[in-house]
């Protein structure tokens, strides 16, 4: 109930800031949002690989990267990991990972990350390998070094408040300039599955600032699209690049939201008689699955409604598989067979229609998005050269 209430408040706050002004393409704020979902992150990884390939083709540039085209990239849990991979710079100040590198990352490291710890009193996985590989891949990079604005969520169990890591917050809250590997582990530290993460940074006065963090899904319930939009709203109002924008209109937003799949067109259904026999652990696992599916649907519903109300429905694309079955519904099944199935889910999803009322496939819609992103980037570069 509290989460739904928070969504509604944010939804109406965003709606209240809109106007009827039509923005020029170069003034549009581009937003990429990636859901949480553990090993199911393979599904949005397939979508990202396709989109980045389209951008490279449209711009005839094999070095084009997603971070070159999006003003804000937000993610929760495994989506936060993907966000870091495509925005963290390498030694040449380019993203250390191309989109095509993400699926191989899951295949190489997934089985070690989701390797049952054998503990009956602690979390299912000890998290040591996950933290180790994040340290190796992301190094000492901090939030301020991200190649575009990021929005990665976590939840502090000591202060009982969400923590949002963004570049634009650093001037007011320098303690949020944490190392990317600490942030990535924290946003992925799902209760039951991984231990919470403790680390420190420093305030502007040099005082120690403590974090006690768990999965960002506790704060955003799996789908960070509303969070990403709120960060984009602030960016549009504060960044000089958008100085002509007086108030936010959804005609000025281009939002791509990627899901990790649900089984809400239910493969798994339960009866009251069946659930009455469950113990606490079974309920916790079921509630997490149900909440993620329901919140994903409601967030999509809220955002779709506001875009349609502003006659900007073509500016929002939600890419989601709503009929996962069998092992593909599990966030921690990192067997090679299941990961291959998840790849197939992502590839098949590209061929599916965006909606029952539209013949346009996700593949076609992403090509349209790629063209818009490319044109906008060129227009902005041209404007900046004058």
From Swiss-Prot:
Major enzyme class: hydrolase
First and last residue of the signal peptide: 1-23
Domain PNPLA: 32-229
Active site location: 77 (nucleophile), 215 (proton acceptor)
Intervals of motif DGA/G: 215-217
Entry keyword Metal-binding: no
Positions occupied by motif GXSXG: 75-79
Location relative to the cell: Vacuole
GO MF assignments: monoacylglycerol lipase activity; nutrient reservoir activity; phospholipase activity
InterPro entries with a match to the protein in the record: Acyl_Trfase/lysoPLipase (IPR016035), PNPLA_dom (IPR002641)
Record EC number: 3.1.1.-
Gene Ontology cellular-component terms listed: vacuole
GO biological process, one term: lipid catabolic process
Expression by tissue: Tuber.
Keyword Glycoprotein assigned: yes
Coiled coil: 321-381
Superkingdom of the source species: Eukaryota
Keywords: Coiled coil, Glycoprotein, Hydrolase, Lipid degradation, Lipid metabolism, Signal, Storage protein, Vacuole
SUPFAM superfamilies for the chain: FabD/lysophospholipase-like
Glycosylation site positions: 115
Any Pfam family the entry gives: Patatin
Chief subcellular location: other
Annotated domain remarks: The nitrogen atoms of the two glycine residues in the GGXR motif define the oxyanion hole, and stabilize the oxyanion that forms during the nucleophilic attack by the catalytic serine during substrate cleavage.
Similarity comment text for this entry: Belongs to the patatin family.
Anything else known: Patatin have a dual role as a somatic storage protein and as an enzyme involved in host resistance.
Protein's name according to its UniProt entry: Patatin-14
């Amino acid at each position: 109930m509290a989460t739904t209430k928070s969504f509604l408040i944010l939804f109406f706050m965003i709606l209240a800031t809109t106007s009827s002004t039509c923005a020029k393409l170069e003034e549009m704020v581009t937003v990429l949002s990636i859901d949480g979902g553990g090993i199911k992150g393979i599904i949005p990884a397939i979508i990202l690989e396709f989109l980045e390939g389209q951008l490279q083709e449209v711009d005839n540039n094999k070095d084009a990267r997603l971070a070159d085209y999006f003003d804000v990239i937000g993610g929760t849990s495994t989506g936060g990991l993907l966000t870091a991979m495509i925005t963290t710079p390498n030694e040449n100040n380019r993203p250390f990972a191309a989109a095509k590198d993400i699926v191989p990352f899951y295949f190489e490291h997934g089985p070690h990350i989701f390797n049952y710890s054998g503990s009956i009193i602690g979390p299912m996985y000890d998290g040591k390998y996950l933290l180790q590989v994040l340290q190796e891949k992301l190094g000492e990079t901090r939030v301020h070094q991200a190649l575009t604005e990021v929005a990665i969520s976590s939840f502090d169990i000591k202060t009982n408040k969400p923590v949002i890591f963004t570049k634009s917050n650093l001037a007011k809250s320098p303690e949020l300039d944490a190392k990317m590997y600490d942030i990535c582990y924290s946003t992925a530290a799902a209760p039951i599955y991984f231990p919470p993460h403790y680390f420190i940074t420093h305030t502007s006065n040099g005082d120690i600032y403590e974090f006690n963090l768990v999965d960002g899904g506790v704060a955003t319930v799996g789908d960070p699209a509303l969070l990403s939009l709120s960060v984009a709203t602030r960016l549009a109002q504060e960044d000089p690049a958008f100085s002509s924008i007086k108030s936010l209109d959804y005609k000025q937003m281009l939002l791509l939201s990627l899901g990790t799949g649900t089984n809400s067109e239910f493969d798994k259904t339960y009866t009251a008689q069946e659930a009455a026999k469950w113990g606490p652990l079974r309920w916790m696992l079921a509630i997490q699955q149900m909440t993620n599916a329901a919140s994903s649907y409601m967030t999509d519903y809220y955002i779709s409604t506001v875009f349609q109300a502003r006659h900007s429905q073509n500016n929002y694309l939600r890419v989601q598989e709503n009929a996962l079955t069998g092992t593909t519904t599990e966030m921690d099944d990192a067997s090679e067979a299941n990961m291959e199935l998840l790849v197939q889910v992502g590839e098949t999803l590209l061929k599916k229609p965006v909606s029952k009322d539209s013949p346009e496939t996700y593949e076609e819609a992403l090509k349209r998005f790629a063209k818009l992103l490319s044109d906008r980037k060129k227009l902005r570069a041209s404007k900046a050269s004058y």
